Amino acid sequence: MPFPSPKNQVPLLGLVSLFGASFSALAQPAQPEASLTPAASPSATPIFFADQTLAHLKQLRQAALASDYAFKQVAHLANNIGPRLTGSVQAAKAVEYVADEVKALGCDVQLEKVMVPHWVRGVETAELTQFPGQAAGTTQKIVLCALGGSVSTPPEGINADTVCVRDFEELKALPREKVNGKIVLFNHSFDKKIAAQGHGGEAYGQAVVYRSDGPVAAAKLGAAACLIRSVGGADYRIPHTGQTNYKDGVPKIPAAAVTAEDADLIAYLAAQGETRMHLVLTPQTLPDVESANVIADIKGSEHPEQVVIVSGHLDSWDLGTGAIDDGAGVAVAMETAHLVRQLHLKPKRTIRVIAWMNEENGSRGSKQYAKDHASEFANHFAVNETDGGADHPIGLNLKAKPEVKEIFEPVAKILQEIGAGTLNLSEHIGADIEPMEKAGVPAFSPMQDSRFYFNYHHTPADTLDKIVPRELQENAAVVAVAAYAVANAEQSLPR
């Protein structure tokens, strides 16, 4: 999952902005008690949320905290279906499952077809075969995983010296002959200190560029392969996978992520002298396959053509079981529909649940949706994507006009009861809803405690046990309350 941009991150003890319905009137200078001419009446502050809507939001919050529906959904996706890499049989099964579940809620369900990539992991091994201080006849195993989309080595592998750099600047400073034919390691650390302060997204944003762009930079100087230090905070020698991006006109070289511990090992030895590696990666890129976004609507009672989207992505990486990334987001979106039906609420605008396909390695699902629905974006009232795990939410990220933050204050007060009343204006919310963000559609997502998320993100440890049921309920409450609030708003949100 691409995480929100660094400026989206706020400290865990973020402050809730203060807002009063009559702030414009309070800002007026005091007037004398008597005046020869009557003072003009201040214009009424627009009402966005009727009292009945606010009452329904409180009901939704409480119902979400009492519901186990979302947990049952993510449990089925993670445990019964398992890893859902785009193009896999598990991904296809997940599409069928989610469609059946939201159909059972009484939603109008469509499977919108999309052709998606089919990349599969193969053998992935590495060992240091020559290094300073080596005992005769020994090697050192390196723990790694291929990056998504990586090309393969020859079946017998590559034998090459390693070159370690911390960043792109160090690589560019090297003459081509120092890189040509070698295995380049980008040893750029994920900043655990700022992640521990609640800025996990910022730490991720600083490091992920080496995963996405490192192999191309190395290939331009003739490297035989590229390794990157895993982008995340995992200990215990666990690698983080993720997509890398090749470019036309630049040779495609094998690419993998090594664990933080192995990156340190290679760098330590390479600093002492020649360090040689045998690397075998045998992934394959197979022909594209047909898949689908799951679209499920609860039709609006007054403005059915106006749409409020709640969403998560259904595909996952293949190392873990895709519980936090992003089974949780799909389950939270499904829970919104479940709660609205359970409480017999009638949203004025259509609430649309979307389970996106192929966020992790291509975003084909969201691109196809944008292509098919671009003419309707003017009637897309607001959009959500939940793709940051399921840790405790402290509020809402909003990508919208600044005045929308003030409009949302009554919603924030209701969410403050569960410690989720912070409102934060963000530059970006989610990869799948980015086309709608760019079209000016107001967007929102839970602002979550991100201290631990990147310890498990894109690793074999992305499993169901990482989800705390109560915190998943809190995320469901945040999304359901925010979605229903805008679905029943008395006026359009400013764009």
Where are the language model's segments positioned?
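Extracellular/luminal Protease-associated
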Residues: 88, 140-254, 321, 422
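Noncatalytic luminal/extracellular "stalk/propeptide" segments of secretory-pathway proteins
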Residues: 36, 42-53, 75, 79-196
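Metal-dependent peptidase/peptidase-like ectodomains
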Residues: 65, 103, 133, 155, ...
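His/Asp/Glu-rich mid-to-C-terminal helical/loop segments that flank catalytic regions of hydrolases
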Residues: 338, 342, 349, 454-495
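Short helix-loop-beta-strand segments that form the rim/entrance of peptidase-like active sites
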Residues: 72, 338-364
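Second-shell loop/turn segments in exported
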Residues: 57-65, 79-89, 160-165, 174, ...
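Soluble metallo-hydrolase cores and metallopeptidase-like ectodomains found primarily
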Residues: 54-56, 129-132, 143-176, 243-323, ...
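N-terminal capping segment at the start of a domain
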Residues: 47-88, 114, 238-243, 315, ...
